[in-house]
């Protein structure tokens, strides 16, 4: 079976984990490897501050805390996303306002955002689906006009850009994931990027269980104490050590994944021309990171048959999000506003193909062969 995903591994990770435990004697949070990873993110993506977290979910939770939401405040987000995007803001007492996506990028529709803004709206959460950027100029203009915060859900967007700017660095906050399913992994982990300097100190406090420990470690106070709400969002330095090996090889991983993405896209171009499938769309002003490669089949039944055919042929393919507004918690904590033109339709038709670092040319060719065979090619 050709697996849908294989966690990335470049070969240096375990040596760095060993160094963390045996040489540095630092396996709790905020150790040397954590600092290396954070500096790398800040330097490579021109971020004001990057803080590693225990997950992409906890990065979103930190962003939600920084937004200072009150019960009943509204947060606008796409329904076509993972539950973490929603739960982070629900925990702050927010009401979720789900809106439709665009048919090309599968990202949140800026016009749909503008249409649902009320006096209770506080935050916009653009989700960069498949590592392809949302229309951030439009979204930021809307946010500025209505004095709203923007928290980018960029879990899939590490190494992607919008008009030359790294995803996660455009809004007030950006949230990355380094889960094993992502392009760069620490097993479980993430990062929050703070792009507005006014929030940097408080972000450190929230991450350090509500204490000003970071100020103490910098010698800015003679002792640290509890000053605000927060939680324990620091990952082990052993996890950061694992991630460091991959950040050192970030371009190699990127190039490898892009080779597979382009091989798929070239191989299926004729299927799209014949109307048998739809291919991913990447606008010219955006650079994506090959986080995933998906096809859209004509109907839900077609997709079900397609996934079954691939499985029988030794290829694991997966559908993706079920719209959050149709889930029990989605109905409880929010509602869909406007017309659902594309969200449910895309959810029912989209299927993702195997794509991971180190995928062999032979396996890539086999996936292409099986997909084309399904269509009699």
Mark where each language-model region is:
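N-terminal "arm"/small-domain region of PLP-dependent enzymes with the aminotransferase-like
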Residues: 1-27, 225-227, 354
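Phosphate-binding glycine-rich loop
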Residues: 28-74, 88-92, 98-99, 165
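Short beta-strand-to-turn element immediately C-terminal to the catalytic PLP-Schiff-base lysine
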Residues: 176-177, 190-195, 244
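Structural detector of well-ordered beta-strand residues that form the stable sheet scaffold
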Residues: 51, 76, 97, 150-151, ...
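Conserved SAM-binding loop
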Residues: 52, 77, 98, 192, ...
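PLP-dependent aminotransferase class I/II
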Residues: 35-39, 44-50, 111, 115, ...
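PLP-dependent aminotransferase-like
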Residues: 65-154, 161
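Conserved active-site segment immediately N-terminal to the catalytic lysine
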Residues: 152-186, 215-217, 222-227, 278
